Structure formats: structure tokens, C-alpha cells
Amino acid sequence: MKRILRIAALFALATAVVPSGATAVEGDLVYVASQSAASVSVIDAGTQEVVATVDLTELGFTPNCKPHHVAVEPDGSHWYVSLIADWRVLKFDRDNNLVGQVEFETPGMLSIDPVNDVLYVGRSMAAVSPPMRIGVIERSSMDIEEVDVFFARPHALMAAREGGRVYTASLAENRMAAVEPAEEVLELVDVPGNLHTFVQFALSPDGQTLVAGGQMSGEILVFDVSDPLQPELKQSLSIGGHPWHPVYSPDGGTIYFPQRTSNAVAVIDTASWEVRDTITGGGLVEPHGSAISADGRWLYVSGRNTSGEYGETPEGATPMGTLNIIDTQSGEVAGVVDVPAYAAGVGAATR
């Protein structure tokens, strides 16, 4: 069996725990939000080592602030994290200095508009009855406006490639929306089938195909968005296992879906819409978030590991979270980075 490299992220002294300060890394960085530990781990994608752990309590946020999702500027200059329980979206620079924040009730998923000065924010899955609105944040000022979407629990969220538009979908009903906030345009789309509970989208590199995962249905739903305000369901595929946060390969030929209750990642061919491979092992326990390197070689998948199935947990301690570094050429977990408890959203710059 191929040996898996395990890189211990410090819960002790080898990794700096910082509220701010220079990361001092020239290459790409990967960010992992630890929802039960009020921290964000910063990982050097080149060395696959933790270079900083941002302790949010040192910045005045509560121990139960629940950092959930991370979005990173395309050039890596700033990154954003949603705090479910503290009702905040935070903005950090590359050196992990907190440079802005805005209040938003129970924030969940984040998505950066690649053209405009906008960050979109949806509602957390933990929110039972949040406002039927998404947030539209001006990134430079961190000012926010809320936009009605007219359905309950808007969670899945993805900005369009051409800018000015965002797609969102409901946890509570089979409904999604295409929204152009600046134009005050909103188109609602009803999706057939039993309750899907849409967790998150992935958008193809050419911007023509939007893919959603249904927690309750276990289905992958493929929408044609060539008519951008009228997503059309073209195909569905049952994979089970609670499909979570997906990501496309840069060439568009593959989409990777963490399967949270199957401890696996489904590798789906986008030409045939069939499962090509299933990745298991390493620290893929309750896999949650995902990101991919700009060249498509490395896939980063977080593992909540709340069951403690991976690693050794001292008596009375909380199990560690994980970031799994997957070699997309071999389809194997090449390394596991230990991070604080309940590793959730993953963010990386996309060029």
C-alpha cells in the first residue's frame, strides 16, 4: 500500500497561531475553516505545510463563532470567511490582517464575482428560518445590500463567470434562482423530483454548465446555463452519500464531489456524466469542502472527522479535522494535513 504522508498541523508550538502577521509565502495558499475551533488554517500549496493558523478568538470573535466557508481573491491578495454564529463575513489580506467585516445573519457559502467588486453570501445550513435573502457585498468597502430570492433557506451559491449574476438554491424546496442584483433581475426555476436539499454548485470553466448536489436525494443535477437566466435541467445522476461542495477541474473534463456520509470523493466524467472513479482513504472522513490547484494536479478536500475515525484523539479531546491532498493523476490521497476540529469550507485562489 502506498504510504500516505501525514503532515501534523500544530495544536502545539511548531505552527504559529496568529491573529495577524506576514504569511511570508510567495506561492499559492489554501485556506481551511475549522468550524468547531474558531480558526482558519493557512497552508502553503507548494510545501503542503501549515504556515499559519488564524485564531479568531484573538481578534475578539467568540469561541463558538463557527467559521464555515472561505473565498479567495483570484490574485490571492485577500480572503474572506463566513462566521455562522457571530453573523459576520470577515476580510483578511494575504498577511492575515483583518481589514474589514460586515454583519449578515447566519452567513454560509461565499462566492466572488470574477469581474465586479462583489462578494455574494448565502445562509448557513444551521439556520432553520433565516431571511429569504442573499447578501451582495462590495468587496472594497465591505458594504452590503440584501436581495430577496423568495424561497426559504438560500444556501448553494455560485457567481457567473461573466460577472453580474449569481445562482442560488434552496435547502428547503426544489427551487433555484438566477439573480442579477445590479439590474434588479431575478428568475426563479422549479426543479423536479423529491426534495433535493441543494448544498452547493460548481460552474464549468466555460460558464455554460452549472452542477448542483442534493443532500437528501443523493443526486447530481446538471443544468445548461447557456441561456444564463433560464437554467435548464439536462441530466441527473444518483451517487448517494450526501454530495457536498464540488469543484471542476480547470479543463472542465472532470468534476469532483465529496460524499460526506460515504467518506469518499466521486470523480465524475463530464462528457459521459458517469462516475469514473471513487477516491477513499487518508483523512477522508466526512469530506466537506474542496478546491483545486490552478494546474489541476492537486485536489484539496477537507474532512470534518467529527467521529474521530481518522487519527488518535486523546481522552476528552475533540477529534482533529483534515485537509486531504489528492493527486488527480493517480487518484490517491498523497498527503493529509491535520487541522483543528470540524474542517469545513476550503478556499484557494483560482487563476
Q: What would you call each of these model-derived segments?
A:
Residues 1-8:
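Bacterial N-terminal signal peptides that target proteins for export
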Residues 8-16:
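Bacterial N-terminal signal peptides
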Residues 13, 21-351:
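Predominantly soluble domains enriched in secretory-pathway, periplasmic, or organellar proteins
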